[in-house]
Amino acid sequence: GDVAKGKKTFVQKCAQCHTVENGGKHKVGPNLWGLFGRKTGQAEGYSYTDANKSKGIVWNNDTLMEYLENPKKYIPGTKMIFAGIKKKGERQDLVAYLKSATS
């Protein structure tokens, strides 16, 4: 994926609810620092739904690609109000950006 394009997508579609930097604060959604390799529902100090806490998968390229296509299908009961990104290329760019920005 293209990190620069992914950053644009993040700013347009994600940044109103999420921060990415180390020590960034939780907004409507959790701060995403340390996302890769972490289990669902584990950002410290954020109040998750039981659905997110009990999903039990680890965030990586594949799980994020699937989740970001249709969040409510992947984690029924999530409170993330986001329809998803249908275009595979756009998701690949976003995941590339998240990988670089959150670690």
Swiss-Prot record:
Keywords: Acetylation, Electron transport, Heme, Iron, Metal-binding, Mitochondrion, Respiratory chain, Transport. Its main location: mitochondrion. The keyword Glycoprotein does not apply. It is found in: Mitochondrion intermembrane space. GO terms for cellular component: mitochondrial intermembrane space. Heme c binds at residues 14, 17-18, 80. The modification N-acetylglycine is found at residue 1. PROSITE patterns: CYTC. One of its GO terms (molecular function) is metal ion binding. InterPro entries: Cyt_c-like_dom, Cyt_c-like_dom_sf, Cyt_c_1A/1B. Binds 1 heme c group covalently per subunit. Electron carrier protein. The oxidized form of the cytochrome c heme group can accept an electron from the heme group of the cytochrome c1 subunit of cytochrome reductase. Cytochrome c then transfers this electron to the cytochrome oxidase complex, the final protein carrier in the mitochondrial electron-transport chain. Belongs to the cytochrome c family. This is Cytochrome c.
